[in-house]
Swiss-Prot record:
Residues 9-80 form the KRAB domain. Coiled coil: none annotated. CDD domains: KRAB_A-box. May be involved in transcriptional regulation. This is Zinc finger protein 26. The gene is Zfp26. GO terms for cellular component: nucleus. SMART domains: KRAB, ZnF_C2H2.
Length: 861
C-alpha cells in the first residue's frame, strides 16, 4: 500500500548543506552556529505553517547530538535523503536506520521480499549509502545498472520492519536490514573522476565527490535552467557534473539539487485544503493550521510558573525562563556579548559581518532579521494590525503597542540607576543613560555635530541632503523625521491626548505637556553657562546660546536671511510661499504660525491669560503684556535718531522709521496701496474682503478690528473716556478725539493733489480721490455693481441676502441699514430735526426739507 506523499517544500529551500571537505574546514564555533541557524529556520517555518514534518536532522540537532556525527556522513546522507524525496514517515525511518548502519541488498533472481541478498553493500556509521546499482539521470527516476530499466523509489513496510525500496519498472526489491556487525564491501570501482583520476563504485559517488572541484564560473543552460561550474557537452546540451544550480522558471530562484527544485515547484501548485477562516491563509496540514490559529485566538498553552506569562510554543517559554534565571548560554566570540537565545546571537553576529539578508522588494532597504523586514513592509502598506483597546490607536508592531499601553497603565519598568528616573522601554533608558555619561559617539561629517545614536545622526544628515521622506497625507508637507510627521498630523486631527492636571490644558505630545508643567512649577532646568540665564526647554537653551556666538545656521534660500532656529526659518519661508496652515474653526481665518492662531482664538473666547500685576488688565499674549508694563514705568528705551520720538520696543521703532524713509513694504494685492506696517495692511484688506471678525455680543454688530469693537462696546455702556479739552465733548475712541481736535485747530493736513481740497483724516483723502479717478474698488460678486466705500458694498449685499439687521422696537419693521431705521423711528417719535431756515418749518428727513425748498423758489421769482 502506497503512503501518501507529504509536501516538504520550505525546509529544503532554507537548509544549508556542506560537502565533506567543506564541513571539515569549519571550526567548532561555526558548527555550533550552523546548529543554531538550522534550528531557528525550522522553528520560524513551523510557526507560520511552512514546515509540515520534523526532519530527523532537526531532531538530532535538538537533542544536541555531538556534531562529529555530522562529520561522519550525516550531511551526505541528508543530501541523498533529499534526492530520494521520501515522505515524512520514510524519512524518519531512513535516518534512524542510517544512524545504526544499513545493509543494502539487491536481487534479480526472484528472491522473496525481505530476504537479504548475497550481492549488496553494507554501511557502517562512517559510510555513505548506495542505491540500487543506480545512476542518477536528469529526471526524477533512477536507472538500474543490470537491466537498464528506470524506476522511482517507493518505500513499503513489512512485518519484520524491514524497509523495501520497490522498483516500479523492474519490480526488484531493495532490502534495508540493520546490521552494524557487517563491514563495508568494496565492489569494483569502475567510474573515474575526469578531474583527479580517482575511481568510484557508481555515478552517485562520483557526483558527491565532484562537488569538491568547484570553480568560479557558472555556466547556465537556457534549455533546462540548469547551471554548472564545469560544463560537458552531451548531444549539444550542457550537462553539469560538478556543483549544480537549478533555476525555477517561475520565480527565478536557484537550488543546488534537482530534488530541491522539484519540491520547490510544488509551492506554486501545491494543494492547501486547510483554510484559516480569520485571514484566509491556507495550509497543507491540519496541525499547521492549529498552530497558526493560536495567533488569532492568542491561545497560549505554556505558562511561566514565575510570572504567569503564557506562550504559544514551549521553545518560547524556555527562552523566557532565561529572563528570570539570567542565563545567557549563547556568547559572541567577537565581542563576548552573551544572549539568551540562539536567534539573538545569530542576529547579533550580523552586526559584525554587516550581513543584512532580508531585503525589502519595494525600497531595497535590508535588515538583519525577518521580523524587522515584516515591520518595515507595513510602513509601505500602512497596515497597523495591533490596536490599543483603551484609545483605539493602532501600531504596525506588537512591541510598539506594548510600549504604548504603558502610557495608560503608568508602568515604567526600566529605571535609571543614576537618577531613579524610569522609562517605558529599554531603548529610552539607553538613550537617557547617555545624558549622564555625555557620550555622543556619532559625528556628522559635514558640520561635526555629535549625536548619542546613529538614528539621530541619520535624521540630522537629512538637513544637509534635503531629504524629507515622511510626507503628510493631508497637506503634503514633508519631514526629515517620523516624529516630526507624527506631531504634525495631530494638528489636522486635533488630537490632544496629554492633559495638564493643574489647569486642564491638553497637548498633542507628551513633551509639550512636560514643558507646559514647568510653567506651573516655575522649573527652568536648562542654564546658560555664559550668562547664567535659565530656560525651561533644552531647545530654548540651544537657541539662546547662539545669541552669544552669533551663529545663525539656518538660511533662507529666497532672500538669504538667517535664523538661529530651524522653526524660525520655517515660519519665515511662509512669507514667501503665502502658506497659512493654521485655520480658525470659528471664523475660518488662517495663520502662518500656531502661536498666531492661539492668540486669535482668544479673541473669540475672551481669554486673557496674561495679567498685569500693576493694574490687573489682561492680555491675550505675553508680548502685549510686556509692552503694556512699560506704560506704567514710562520706559521708552528705543529712540528715533531723526525726530527723537521714543518707543517701547525695537519693532515699533523700526515701523516708525519707515515714515522717514518712505519704505512701505506691505502692499495690497487688490488696489496696490502700500503700508509701513503689516498690521496696517491686514486691517486694510478687510475693506476688500468685507471680513469682520470682531462681533458685539450685545447687538451682533461686527467690526474689522478689535479696537473698533472696544469703541463700540463703550456705546452700549455709555462710556466715553476720551474728552476734548476745548469743548468738553467726549468720545469712545482716541482716534475719534484726534479727528475732532482738528476742528478746533482748523488743521486739515491731508490735501487732494487734483482739486486742492483738504481733509482732517487721512482715510477721507483716498475716498475723495476716487471721485476724480472714478475708481470703485469694492465690487459685488453677485451682480458686479461697484462702490466707493466698503460700507456701501456691505449695505448693498443685504439686498441679495435679504438681511435686515435693524429692527424697529415699536412696530417690528426691519431695515437693511441703520439710517433707514433712524428715519423710520421719527415717525413714531415725531422728531423733525431738519429745519428749513426760510420759513422755520421742520422735517423728519433732509430729503423732505429739500423738496419743501422748491415752492419758495417760485415765491422769490
Amino acid at each position: 500500500m502506497e503512503t501518501q506523499q507529504v509536501d516538504a517544500v520550505t525546509f529544503e529551500d532554507v537548509a544549508v548543506d556542506f560537502t565533506q571537505e567543506e564541513w571539515t574546514s569549519l571550526d567548532p564555533v561555526q558548527r555550533n552556529l550552523y546548529r543554531d541557524v538550522m534550528l531557528e529556520n525550522y522553528q520560524n517555518l513551523a510557526t507560520v505553517g511552512g514546515q509540515m514534518f520534523k526532519p530527523s536532522l532537526i531532531s538530532w540537532l535538538e537533542k544536541k547530538v555531538e556534531l562529529t556525527v555530522i562529520e561522519q556522513g550525516i550531511l551526505q546522507e541528508w543530501e541523498m535523503h533529499l534526492k530520494t524525496k521520501r515522505t515524512a514517515l520514510q524519512q524518519d525511518r531512513f535516518w534512524s536506520d542510517m544512524s545504526n548502519g544499513m545493509q543494502l541488498g539487491r536481487e534479480h533472481s526472484g528472491g522473496e521480499p525481505g530476504d537479504p541478498v548475497q550481492v549488496g553493500a553494507v554501511f557502517s556509521e562512517d559510510s555513505c549509502p548506495q542505491t540500487h546499482s543506480s545512476t542518477s539521470n536528469t529526471g526524477n527516476t533512477f536507472a538500474c545498472n543490470l537491466d537498464g530499466k528506470d524506476f522511482q523509489p517507493l518505500l513499503k513496510e513489512t512485518s519484520t520492519e524491514e524497509n523495501i525500496v520497490q522498483l516500479n519498472q523492474c519490480v526488484k526489491p531493495l532490502i534495508f536490514t540493520p546490521d552494524v556487525s557487517q563491514k563495508k564491501c568494496t565492489p569494483e570501482k569502475s567510474v573515474e573522476c575526469s578531474d583527479c583520476g580517482e575511481t568510484f563504485v557508481n555515478q552517485l559517488e562520483l557526483q558527491t565527490h565532484s562537488s569538491s572541484h568547484r570553480e568560479k564560473n557558472i555556466h547556465k543552460s537556457e534549455e533546462c535552467g540548469q547551471a554548472s561550474t564545469h560544463p560537458i557537452s552531451h548531444g549539444g546540451h550542457v550537462i553539469p557534473t560538478e556543483k549544480k544550480y537549478y533555476e525555477c522558471k517561475k520565480c527565478e530562484k536557484f537550488f543546488t539539487h534537482p530534488v530541491y527544485l522539484n519540491i520547490h515547484m510544488q509551492s506554486h501548485t501545491v494543494e492547501k485544503p486547510y483554510d484559516c477562516k480569520e485571514c484566509g491563509k491556507a495550509f497543507t496540514e491540519r496541525s499547521s493550521l492549529i498552530v497558526h490559529l493560536r495567533q488569532h485566538t492568542r491561545e497560549k498553552s505554556y505558562e511561566c510558573k514565575e510570572c504567569g506569562k503564557t506562550f504559544i510554543q514551549p521553545s518560547r517559554l524556555t527562552e523566557h525562563m532565561r529572563s528570570h534565571t539570567g542565563e545567557k548560554p549563547y556568547q559572541c566570540d567577537q565581542c563576548g556579548n552573551a544572549f539568551a537565545s540562539s536567534s539573538y546571537l545569530t542576529t547579533h553576529l550580523r552586526t559584525h559581518t554587516g550581513e543584512k539578508p532580508f531585503e525589502c522588494n519595494i525600497c531595497g532597504k535590508a535588515f538583519t532579521r525577518s521580523s524587522y523586514l515584516l515591520g518595515h513592509i507595513r510602513t509601505h502598506t500602512g497596515e497597523k494590525p495591533y490596536e490599543c483597546k483603551v484609545c483605539g490607536k493602532a501600531f504596525s508592531g506588537r512591541s510598539w503597542l506594548t510600549i504604548h499601553l504603558r502610557k495608560h497603565t503608568g508602568e515604567r519598568p526600566y529605571p535609571c540607576t543614576e537618577c531613579e528616573k524610569a522609562f517605558t522601554s529599554f531603548a529610552q533608558l539607553t538613550e537617557h543613560i547617555k545624558t549622564h555619561t555625555g557620550e555622543k559617539p556619532f559625528r556628522c561629517k559635514v558640520c561635526a555635530r555629535t549625536f548619542r545614536n546613529s538614528s539621530c545622526l541619520k535624521t540630522h544628515f537629512r538637513i544637509h541632503t534635503g531629504i524629507k521622506p515622511y510626507k503628510c497625507n493631508y497637506c503634503g508637507k514633508a519631514f526629515t523625521a517620523r516624529s516630526g510627521l507624527t506631531k504634525h498630523v495631530l494638528i489636522h486631527n486635533g488630537e490632544k491626548p496629554y492633559e495638564c492636571k493643574e489647569c486642564g490644558k491638553a497637548f498633542s505630545t507628551s513633551s509639550g505637556l512636560v514643558e507646559h508643567i514647568r510653567i506651573h512649577t516655575g522649573e527652568k532646568p536648562f542654564e546658560c553657562y555664559q550668562c547664567g540665564k535659565a530656560l525651561a526647554h533644552s531647545s530654548s537653551l540651544v537657541g539662546h546660546l547662539r545669541t552669544h556666538t552669533g551663529e545663525k545656521p539656518f538660511e533662507c534660500n529666497q532672500c538669504d536671511k538667517t535664523f538661529t532656529r530651524s522653526s524660525y526659518l520655517r515660519i519665515h519661508m511662509r512669507t514667501h510661499t503665502g502658506e497659512k496652515p493654521y485655520e480658525c474653526k470659528e471664523c475660518g481665518k488662517t495663520f502662518p504660525e500656531r502661536s498666531c492662531l492661539t492668540k486669535h482664538i482668544r479673541t473669540h473666547t475672551g481669554e486673557r491669560p496674561y495679567e498685569c500685576k500693576e493694574c490687573g488688565k489682561g492680555f491675550i499674549s505675553f508680548a502685549q503684556l510686556t509692552v503694556h508694563i512699560k506704560t506704567h514705568s514710562s520706559e521708552r528705551p528705543f529712540q528715533c535718531k531723526v525726530c527723537t520720538k521714543s518707543f517701547r520696543n525695537s519693532s515699533s521703532l523700526e515701523t516708525h522709521f519707515r515714515i522717514h524713509t518712505g519704505v512701505k513694504p506691505y502692499k495690497c494685492s487688490y488696489c496696490g496701496k502700500a503700508f509701513t506696517a503689516r498690521s496696517g495692511l491686514t486691517i486694510h484688506l478687510r475693506n476688500h474682503t468685507g471680513e469682520k471678525s470682531y462681533a458685539c455680543q450685545e447687538c451682533g454688530k461686527a467690526f474689522s478690528t478689535s479696537s473698533g469693537l472696544i469703541a463700540h462696546i463703550r456705546s452700549h455702556k455709555g462710556e466715553k473716556p476720551f474728552e476734548c479739552d476745548h469743548c468738553g465733548k467726549a468720545f469712545a475712541s482716541s482716534s475719534y478725539l484726534n479727528v475732532h481736535l482738528k476742528i478746533h485747530t482748523g488743521e486739515k493736513p491731508f490735501q487732494c493733489t487734483v482739486c486742492g481740497k483738504t481733509f482732517t483724516c487721512s482715510s477721507y483723502l483716498p475716498v475723495h480721490m476716487r471721485t476724480h479717478t472714478g475708481e470703485k474698488p469694492f465690487q459685488c460678486i453677485i451682480c458686479g455693481k461697484s462702490f466707493l466705500w466698503s460700507s456701501y458694498l456691505r449695505v448693498h449685499m443685504r439686498i441679495h441676502t435679504g438681511e435686515k439687521p435693524y429692527v424697529c422696537q415699536y412696530c417690528g419693521k426691519a431695515f437693511t441699514e441703520h439710517s433707514g431705521l433712524n428715519k423710520h423711528l421719527r415717525k413714531h417719535t415725531g422728531e423733525k430735526p431738519y429745519e428749513y431756515k426760510e420759513c422755520g418749518e421742520n422735517f423728519t428727513t433732509s430729503a423732505d426739507a429739500n423738496e419743501h425748498e422748491t415752492p419758495h423758489w417760485g415765491e422769490n421769482l
